Amino acid sequence: MMLLTIIAPPSMEEELIDWLLTQPNITGFTSQTANGHGSGHEMNIAEQVSGRRRQITFMIVLQKLMAESIIVDLKHCFSGSRLHYWLSPLTEHGSI
């Protein structure tokens, strides 16, 4: 299993939620507000002063091939949108 993490600007939150909900290989996901920090981000003046940029994080657990397929589709549907992602191995998951 893999954990696909997507970082999006707040302006894309609703559009990305709608898109993720229409994907047949995604049975659920988690989203949360996060703050990005660092010099590698384009920040406006207020963000530069506060040292953070608001963003939305999406986390999706998928089989590797499904995750790779979702990434291809994201690149096609959201080209140039400044989404950032990473794919990490997930050693264990479940419910308690």
Predicted regions and their residues:
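Positively charged, small/polar-rich N-terminal and surface patches that mediate targeting and assembly
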Residues: 1-96
